[in-house]
Amino acid sequence: MKNPAGANEVLRTLALEDGEHDVLAVLNDQTADGRDVSWVWDADFEVLAGRLRHVTCSGTRAAEMALRLKYAGVPTDRLAVEPSLGAALDRAVAGANGRLVAIPTYTAMLELRQELVGRGVAGSSFG
């Protein structure tokens, strides 16, 4: 996700699925992501607020992501902030009840992929 429109599409897709979701939300503000992450306040996270079992927030703006989710109505006892992606992934996987949904910004997606390759759970090429 990189802007409200992209985030809203992800959120609406998740809202179509039954049950609660365990989420790893990774918000970075690197150049390729865009330094200004205020767009998260324009995304409709409220659509999932009551359907998030647990959210682990990570990335360079992990605290901002958690704050946005709090204001969207996600109870604080369902939120965790872990800026280190590796530690956040460990925490999110350990707390997940089955499937874990990752919602990263662009550079976070690249970092997450590298982390998964390093752990041997993803291939090293895109092909």
What are these regions (language model features)?
Residues 1-127:
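ATP-dependent carboxylate-amine ligase
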